[in-house]
Regions:
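Helicase motor core with emphasis on the C-terminal RecA-like subdomain
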Residues: 1-3, 124-125
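Conserved pre-motif I regulatory segment
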Residues: 2-50, 67
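Conserved nucleic-acid-binding Ia/Ib motif block in the N-terminal RecA-like helicase ATPase lobe
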Residues: 11, 16-27, 35, 74-131
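The conserved Walker
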Residues: 51-55
Length: 131
């Protein structure tokens, strides 16, 4: 996919609310992995991406999830994100909190070795996304 014409998040077809959250979070323009992954993910297509650490892969999959969840009924987990490490799970949660603010997308994280009661409380809040 040629991403040369997609130099900013506005050209990706994102809502104004999400664009504002991106700006607030310090995102100025999509990285190559984001420019390639976001458009097909917004249409519901499965996406597989490979890029080096620090290239914005987490945002590349969180952005379309937040955008799609904004128009779906609330009240139960509507997305499940699996990560291979606790560190990546917490990073993903932080990204969701930053980019899902305007759409009021909530998330909780479940990881081994953490306080089980706190995690149960998080589940009882019926988050939109379970990491």
């Amino acid at each position: 996919m040629d991403t040369s014409a997609q130099t900013n998040f506005h050209t990706l077809g994102l809502s104004e609310a999400l664009l504002q959250d991106l700006t607030t979070a310090g995102f100025t323009s999509p990285t190559p992995i984001q420019a390639q992954a976001i458009p097909p993910a917004l249409t519901g297509r499965d996406v597989i991406g490979c890029a080096q650490t620090g290239t914005g892969k987490t945002a590349a999959f969180v952005i379309p999830i937040v955008e799609r969840l904004a128009v779906l009924p609330k009240g139960q987990p509507r997305a499940l994100i699996l990560t291979p490490t606790r560190e990546l799970a917490l990073q993903t949660l932080t990204t969701i909190e930053r980019l899902g603010r305007s759409h009021r997308v909530s998330a909780t994280v479940i990881v081994g070795g953490a306080d089980m009661q706190a995690q149960v409380r998080g589940l009882r809040q019926r988050p939109d996304i379970l990491v």
